[in-house]
Amino acid sequence: YDNIVFTRFINFEDSIFVKKLNWSGCLQEEDRKIVIDTKNNPIFDKSIYSSVNKELIDYIEKNKITEIYLCGIDTECCVLKTAFDLFELGYNVYVLKDYCACTHGVERHNNALDILRRNIGKEYIV
């Protein structure tokens, strides 16, 4: 791949995730650590499900990227929402199913992949 980027979820004490879901993950720096070597590739921070924000879109446009290969955790929320957002912006987004996972099990992962097949096209789930 010519361009590789990472995203990192950062939660806050007053976030919607804490307030409405009582989810306190990723509040601490240790919980937000990227555990593989990023090899100095860009890291974009986010505090919502989607990785799509102005900073990422600016990077995509600056580098003239038209095809995006997406992987990550959790398939049924962050990956799904990011794939939908990129699809709606007109990008060819391929979800690398074997490089995605769900912390709530394989069944939810597979359900998310089925939803993605239906909504962005089965040929984009690889």
Feature roles, as predicted:
Residues 1-14:
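Von Willebrand factor
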Residues 3, 17, 21-126:
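Active-site-adjacent betaalpha module
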